[in-house]
Structure formats: structure tokens, C-alpha cells
């Protein structure tokens, strides 16, 4: 399924030099799924929890219903920017 491919892609992106976290969004059956992965000190779980999802420090996810990809990406960016600004990540 596209969600499995998204999770695999998120894992592969961590192999890029100096990448500490990756977020891959996929559309499947009318929903948008985020696969979040990280290494080292980046806690993607708290980011995904702010979006209604969850998981573990280095592997987490969330889902969006009734939204499009552009809006989902904007929402993810907004949460990350706010958490950086607040010193949460």
C-alpha cells in the first residue's frame, strides 16, 4: 500500500547526510497519512501528537481526513515551526 511505501521512504531519507528527521505524506483511500522518522535527538512523536497522531520517539505517524495535500503540508509545517519557536524541538 502507499502508506507502507511512505514509511519506507521516510526511513530511506534518514540515510541522507545531516538529515535528522523526515516526513512523508501519502494519500490512500481519501486520507492523508504522515510517516515521520528521526534519528538522534529529534522526537517526531511529539510532533505527530500535535497533529492527533502518535507513535515512538523515532517512528510516528498521523492521519488527516477531509483535507487536501496542500493543507496537510501547511499544517505540518506550521506545527514544526511553532514547536521550534517554542523550543520544544
Model-assigned labels for residue ranges:
Residues 1-89:
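Gly/His-enriched, cation/cofactor- and phosphate-binding structural elements
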Amino acid at each position: 500500500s502507499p502508506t507502507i511505501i511512505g514509511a519506507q521512504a521516510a526511513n530511506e531519507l534518514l540515510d541522507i547526510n545531516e538529515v535528522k528527521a523526515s516526513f512523508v505524506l501519502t494519500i490512500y483511500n481519501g486520507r492523508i497519512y504522515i510517516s515521520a522518522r528521526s534519528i538522534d535527538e529529534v522526537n517526531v512523536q511529539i510532533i505527530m501528537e500535535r497533529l492527533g497522531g502518535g507513535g515512538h520517539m523515532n517512528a510516528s505517524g498521523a492521519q488527516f481526513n477531509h483535507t487536501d495535500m496542500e493543507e496537510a503540508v501547511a499544517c505540518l509545517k506550521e506545527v514544526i515551526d511553532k514547536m521550534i519557536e517554542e523550543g520544544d524541538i
